[in-house]
Amino acid sequence: MFVIKSNLPAWLFSGLLALAAPLCMAAEEEVTADQVVSALESTFEVHPGERRNHTKGTCAVGEFVGSPEAHVYTRSALFSGKPLPVVARFSLPGGNPKVPDTAKIPRGMAVEFRLPGGSLQHMTMLNTPVFGAASPQTFFDDIVAKKPDPSTGKPDPEKIKAFKASHPDSLPQAEFLAKNNPPPSWVNSSYFGIHTFKFVNAKNKITLVRWRFVPEDGEKQMTDAELKSAQPDFLEQKLIDRVKHGPVRWDMMLTIGEPGDPADNPTLMWPANRKEIKVGTLTLSSAAPQKGAACEKLNFDPLVMADGIEPTNDPVLLFRSPAYAISFGKRLSGN
């Protein structure tokens, strides 16, 4: 299992990740990280110096205060009760830097938590409660199916239809997006950790958990009429304007798993009656366009974890680290 423990300064850690780009997945994987990154480049074209996925984004900074009550489940310093600096990035999936903010696709929030001693904790989240693939192969096939037809400049509807028919694990997220319009602002959405993680406490007891961040500004959705009339770029400026009037906050809610809950499949939800507790508050106090801002050069690898939090064997979660490293290495080199 490939897990990064981050007791290194952020600048040095990022440099080491660039060297990790050649990492490949275990032999049993159907596709490699290189193939996925190449597929993203083929479908969305190469934008030098930019992320291959979640290319369009906005930076924000602030702090996180975790609740010591979480120490029942984890020894992580993330929940010390002391303010910790954070860098966040909001983004839209895909490699198109000009994707319209009205697109009915997921919204992402990635956060780097800076813990005492130089260690880091990353969380990469979406505003959908499930992911769109149970395996790297499905994720790869989805990217390939979305490649624009040269004659139309748009994805081939027949290829999209065939993909959905042959990949039922892609349907739960697609159905959620079809039923729920996008939020009018980054601050009006909950963000889900998608994957299941292991919390390890001081006695080395392991608890399976999932988490989500719930906005204090409330969850809202745009109407169909608002989607039709909205400009293609409004999310960034709305966030910048919002934080000028005061900080924005999300409560971190932890869901406690029970025996039998799916641990390795991010397309499956847990039962709604699982125990849930508040374990912290994320506060963002400023925001800026990503060019030259705090989040631009960060690699929000979800396997960057501080002591007390560990990954499960979710194949999608484990696949993300080498894919992120390859993309990050290309960005550092200006490609």
Predicted regions and their residues:
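Active-site-adjacent core segments of small-molecule enzymes
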Residues: 27-335
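Bacterial N-terminal signal peptides
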Residues: 11-22
